[in-house]
Amino acid sequence: MYSQVEHPAGGYKKLFETVEELSSPVTAHVTGRIPTWLRGSLLRCGPGLFEVGAEPFYHLFDGQALLHKFDFKEGHVTYHRRFVRTDAYVRAMTEKRIVITEFGTYAYPDPCKNIFSRFFSYFKGVEVTDNALVNVYPVGEDYYACTETNFITKINPDTLETIKQVDLCKYVSVNGATAHPHVENDGTVYNIGNCFGKNFSLAYNIIRIPPLQADKEDPMNKSEVVVQFPCSDRFKPSYVHSFGLTPNYIVFVETPVKINLLKFLSSWSLWGANYMDCFESNETMGVWLHVAEKKKGRLLNIKYRTSAFNLFHHINTFEDNGFLIVDLCTWKGFEFVYNYLYLANLRANWDEVKKQAEKAPQPEARRYVLPLRIDKADTGKNLVTLPYTTATATLRSDETVWLEPEVIFSGPRHAFEFPQINYKKYGGKPYTYTYGLGLNHFVPDRLCKLNVKTKETWVWQEPDSYPSEPIFVSHPDALEEDDGVVLSIVISPGSGPKPAYLLILNAKDMSEVARAEVEVNIPVTFHGLFKRA
């Protein structure tokens, strides 16, 4: 999958430039042929405003949320985008400065306030951002843009207008929730967030939002906690970006990247800090994996352990003959990868980008296998009996199960990230294919298809072109897992008057089917979905 492609021209810097929203959709110029069955909207979130006046944002996850939409209808494509009217955005525009602290940018107090009003404002509590720049997902008939705090933002998926802010704390006991919920085919939504558990210790709650019922009541009102995972460190919860779900089990991976809660509360309130200032790494804990029975809400009393890694994205999780297979996009070691995602690093010249990436944790896609039943008589033995994997699970004398992975992709400073699968049919089930964004020293420069069984890869790549997360859209009459197309927004700043386009690939061989070009730059986007018409 990887090749030594260089980017000396630095076209990737266009990914991190401020753009204006559009007053109305623009028509894209199509080359190739859009499949007639492809009808609906590609919705994506990302940062679109990287400074407010003279005040810059510093981290990749700080820019103000911009919602994008490509509409497909009868072979034609239009593009639209609007800023999400979050409190963070509206107040910044009103006061012409950064008002709410973001992931890596501290919001300084209003200089017009006197010292006493600024002092007392510190004790009103932490003002959490609602900057919904990470993902968009459905709940019932509604759609929400989200980040990773307790605030999500209801949006209109047709007009991209902002409807209202929603505080998850008013419905369930969580301090925040991930931007990667699982949405089942019946509309049930599962997510995870940290919370205060027993004896004021931190814990992690799995929340369930039911599908829309006949009474048409907002499903958010029926949200509930279905299981609680304990925290390995009383006051330092791990950073959680995603989790695994199968028909019968929930998998939570607790990594050594920790949030120092005391530092979060004291530093933030008293002398000013941002979210990044409150992360630290536990260099000795490694990784703990927790499993719960989904329907009974009961924790499995098995202690799974492995060596340290960062984790942001689960590829897929499934059950097979008494085992859970957990496929992950990992980054080796305990150092936090986000330390390398400051905009100054990402906007640097190519040689400096490579230099910084050489210091960062090494990416690797891995398969872990977790036995669901253990026998003390098997101490010292590998418990994995599945014939198709080299992953091992060894029962130790302290009754922990030590896991060693099977590597399904690894390349020097080349990551297989932002993974997508045929989720509707194969999410939580045995599968063969995953699609990912290829990161070359953190620069996205290819789209990849990976056969997780054979490790065969297919790649789309063009010079000085920078794609986004691939979104798989299944053919409505699909007979095979990879019958469909892959959608990605590509930035190609050196290609003339049309610097960006929506790329459509054949999901079987990653060959180009069509592209829809627009005459505006499109900054980096993180995640999204395809909403069928």
Swiss-Prot record:
The keyword tRNA-binding does not apply. Palmitoylation by LRAT regulates ligand binding specificity; the palmitoylated form (membrane form) specifically binds all-trans-retinyl-palmitate, while the soluble unpalmitoylated form binds all-trans-retinol (vitamin A). A lipid is attached at residues 112, 231, 329 (S-palmitoyl cysteine). Fe cation binds at residues 180, 241, 313, 527. It catalyses: an all-trans-retinyl ester + H2O = 11-cis-retinol + a fatty acid + H(+); lutein = (3R,3'S)-zeaxanthin; all-trans-retinyl hexadecanoate + H2O = 11-cis-retinol + hexadecanoate + H(+). Retinal pigment epithelium specific. It is a lipid-anchor. Binds 1 Fe(2+) ion per subunit. GO terms for molecular function: all-trans-retinyl-ester hydrolase, 11-cis retinol forming activity; all-trans-retinyl-palmitate hydrolase, 11-cis retinol forming activity; cardiolipin binding; isomerase activity; metal ion binding; oxidoreductase activity, acting on single donors with incorporation of molecular oxygen, incorporation of two atoms of oxygen; phosphatidylcholine binding; phosphatidylserine binding. The keyword Transmembrane helix does not apply. Its EC number is 3.1.1.64, 5.3.3.22. Its cofactor is Fe(2+). It is found in: Cytoplasm; Cell membrane; Microsome membrane. Keywords: Cell membrane, Cytoplasm, Endoplasmic reticulum, Hydrolase, Iron, Isomerase, Lipid metabolism, Lipoprotein, Membrane, Metal-binding, Microsome, Palmitate, Phosphoprotein, Sensory transduction, Vision. GO terms for cellular component: endoplasmic reticulum membrane; membrane; plasma membrane. The modification Phosphoserine is found at residue 117. InterPro entries: Carotenoid_Oase. One of its GO terms (biological process) is retinoid metabolic process. Belongs to the carotenoid oxygenase family. Critical isomerohydrolase in the retinoid cycle involved in regeneration of 11-cis-retinal, the chromophore of rod and cone opsins. Catalyzes the cleavage and isomerization of all-trans-retinyl fatty acid esters to 11-cis-retinol which is further oxidized by 11-cis retinol dehydrogenase to 11-cis-retinal for use as visual chromophore. Essential for the production of 11-cis retinal for both rod and cone photoreceptors. Also capable of catalyzing the isomerization of lutein to meso-zeaxanthin an eye-specific carotenoid. This is Retinoid isomerohydrolase. The gene is RPE65.
